[in-house]
Amino acid sequence: DYKDYMNEQVKKNIPESEKVRVILGGKERMDTIKNGTTAITNDNGIHDDDVIVIHDAVRPFVTEKILNDSIDCAAEYGACVCGLPCADTILHSKGGEYVEDIPVRSELYSGQAPDSFRLAHFIQMQDNLTEEQKKVITGTSQICTMNNQPIHLIEGDAINFKITTDSDLLIVRTLLGGK
């Protein structure tokens, strides 16, 4: 069973592993997040100053600065996402054949994880989503935009890149000295 295997790995590799729980994911991204928030609240309750940090395993090079800034930002503003100004021109195309629009690059940012939120408010926003909205979410911070709630932006870091392609894996191997 995958959960048993993960629990064994946690105990074997993480100091103070009693503070770590493995929570099974769900069919959709939002199901996984709901499983996590439910486990947190069942174990600990919810306090007004609690902050939840949601991060993707496909971004293993997140920095301590990003994590600390994200937590501080969410504590102050309620919701936080990190990102970088887009370096490339973005082309908007509905079918991939013709360019419909070219947005103003100076107004665009490439979103990264983590996303951080005051937990109680996040759970309320999560519970307000329709089933249709839950299916189209590509980033946790969209929960805020779908609830017409502001989300504060902090500066990310290029090293906090997402590993999704073969070329990303090549970069990782290079960073790790060819391993």
Please name every model-derived segment.
Residues 18-21, 109, 152, 161-162:
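Structural signal for short hydrophobic segments within the conserved structured cores
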Residues 52-53:
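Short aromatic/hydrophobic "clamp" motif used to bind/position activated sugar donors
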Residues 1-49, 129-132:
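Conserved N-terminal catalytic core of the sugar/cofactor nucleotidyltransferase
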Residues 6-10, 70, 172:
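Hydrophobic packing residues within well-ordered alpha-helices of enzyme cores
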Residues 61-154:
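Conserved core of the sugar-phosphate nucleotidyltransferase
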Residues 160-179:
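Hydrophobic helical membrane-anchoring modules
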Residues 41, 45, 72-75, 177:
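Residue-level signal for alpha-helix termini/capping positions
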Residues 56:
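Substrate/cofactor-recognition hotspot
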